[in-house]
Amino acid sequence: MKFTIPANAPAKPFHKHWQFCVGSGHAAMAMRTDYCEQLKQIHDELGIERVRFHGIFSDDMHTYDTMSTVMPMPGSEQVPFYENSFRLPGLVYDNVLKAGMKPFVELSFMPSPMAKRPTRGTFYWKPCIAPPKDEAQWQAYIQKFVRFLLNRYGKEEVETWFFEVWNEPDLKTPFFDGTQEDYFRLYEITAKAVKAVDNKLKVGGPATSNSKWVAAFVDYCKAHDAPVDFITTHQYAGDPISEVCDQKDADHMKDTAEIQAEYKVDFTQLFAGLKPEDGLLPMFRRTMPDNTETDDLNRDLLRDAAEQVQKQADGLPVYYTEWNGCATFGARGNDTRKVAAYDVRAALSAEDFIEGSSIWCFSDIFEELHPFPEEFHGGYGLVTQHGIAKPLFHALRLLGQAGDKRLELPGALDGEVSVAAFRDAADTQLTVLATKQNLHHFAGQSTPATPVEIEVELDAKPQSVQLCRIDEEHGNPLKCWQAMGEPEDMTPAQVQQVIDESAVDYAPAPYEYADGKLTVKTELVTNDLAFIRIVK
């Protein structure tokens, strides 16, 4: 397969929207030293500017405590005394700022004493996901929180932050015990409370899964004079909980409760052959299969959804505050180059429709379901619990370094094998990315290599040509870990060994130059990535 990069290819600014933000485990995680070290690594090496997490108001942050939450003895719920403090959120945001980043503030979830119902989400840390029982009390709480931030960090700093109301309110069981109307009302009173303290603060939503509710949300805000500065939503290629939105009308989706009601499983059959001592991960993987491996999903889903959402947003900037190749926690592909190939291609294809985005998430220091002990357990992170960089980390680092201009190559991203090209501002260096992307990664491991020929029109022979690959042998920490026997409790020496053995960098590459054309040849198997750097 041959691709040509013409000398006169027009260039446009390369919009690295994934550097806007990154997702994270819940707020309390940001008080861990290892979390903070990895967050700084993500900022310093990938250039990511913000971090977003759930649960800044959850009970483990102790922002609103009563006698019944502190000392739940019989009759304590009748005692009227309470304590409202944002000391722990302050420690969390202090750590974010020390890492060189800014918080993308997700206003979630509900302090349980303030909730209309005691509904808990399905997470390991059990957040309260009900709406407030007293709207005036909630608004006063939000206003006090905003004043706390302004006092602690200053008006000039906080006005650069973003405030997003809740997370995925369309998913009733894990995130919001209410209707669409309930969420819209919650958004309205919350946004108005924020603006009442400082009208320059940026507030937005609806923070839905699968690009849903945007048109209805915009209409509601207009009808109720609810302030909204930006639109947020989420999109995964495969999602086992809420169904994949692979349609132009992003509003008409099944309710999560309907999907779960249809989900029937015979656990006796499901767990046949497993032994209790095998641990939780094999059981979990059978319970939540990775549908990116079994279903024929749209490789252009993020682009198609973002294009539609941009139209529905009615001129407001669109931020995808969660996205990735797979929403299945524990999926084997999350530790492999499969997600790297998908995310890089998706980021490039959706570039024109997204103001900023946030890959979910930066680290396997993460406790939504359970803190799995295996170093490679299919977590969402760019790095493992011990900070070992996964293939997606390497891919984003290389893509971020590719240049500030992107060459316009119509149709070059359309096929399974695709290319993109970038140059620096001075036009002294050109980087070409070639990849063979397919979500059926494990089924496609044995596919034959595809020969790829890159032809670049150049006025003169280049000073150097270098190649950096992410494939089965390069940038594959999972393979290194497996080769050492899959140690569960890794020593510092073992961690460093995997880091060293899976590091990737550019090396001289063979090429031909004749008649004003540079030719580089390589081969790609499923989900390989090849970065070619040409110094003119």
Q: Positions of the model-derived regions?
A:
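Mature N-terminal, pre-catalytic/accessory segment of carbohydrate-active enzymes
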Residues: 1-49, 526, 536
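Short, acidic/polar
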Residues: 29-43, 213-221, 340-347
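Carbohydrate-binding surface patches
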Residues: 414-461, 466-486, 523-531
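C-terminal beta-strand-rich structural cap/linker in extracellular carbohydrate-active enzymes
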Residues: 488-536
